[in-house]
């Protein structure tokens, strides 16, 4: 479920960025004189503004709701972790007693 929500979250984020980039700014009236007239658009002269604004608000709401749900799911996950995920802790090593020094077989020192 977490992965599916993450995919939906990414799609909503990309759609939100796309919708924001497609909207005309407040000072976009100058573009009409250079051939970017509103009469040739899909929604007419004023129809796209309302549609784009509502879709942006809807996607922004979905973005915030899904981000809160993903954060809640992520904070409630239990750490099952494998031994490869926690490499900062040193491995337990077996410590043995050092071997006793060998007793000389002769009385002549080396």
UniProtKB/Swiss-Prot annotation:
Keyword Metal-binding in record: no
UniProt PTM: The N-terminus is blocked.
Periplasmic-facing ranges: 1-13, 67-110
Annotated effect of mutating residue 42 to P: Affects activity
Gene Ontology, cellular component aspect: cell envelope Sec protein transport complex; membrane; plasma membrane
Recorded consequence of changing residue 41 to P: Affects activity
Compartment(s): Cell inner membrane
Source organism, top-level taxon: Bacteria
InterPro entries from the UniProt entry: SecG (IPR004692)
Regions crossing the membrane: 14-25, 51-66
Cytoplasmic face of the membrane: 26-50
Residue ranges, annotated region (Disordered): 81-110
Family statement drawn from the similarity comment of this UniProt entry: Belongs to the SecG family.
Official protein name in the record: Protein-export membrane protein SecG
Organism (species): Escherichia coli (strain K12)
């Amino acid at each position: 479920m977490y992965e599916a929500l993450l995919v939906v979250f990414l799609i909503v984020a990309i759609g939100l960025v796309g919708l924001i980039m497609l909207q005309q700014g407040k000072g976009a009236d100058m573009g009409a004189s250079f051939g970017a007239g509103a009469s040739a658009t899909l929604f007419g002269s004023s129809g796209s503004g309302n549609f784009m604004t509502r879709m942006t608000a809807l996607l922004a709401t979905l973005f915030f709701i899904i981000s809160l749900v993903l954060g809640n799911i992520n904070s409630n996950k239990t750490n099952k972790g494998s031994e490869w995920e926690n490499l900062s802790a040193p491995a337990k090593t077996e410590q043995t007693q050092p071997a006793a020094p060998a007793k000389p077989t002769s009385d002549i020192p080396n």
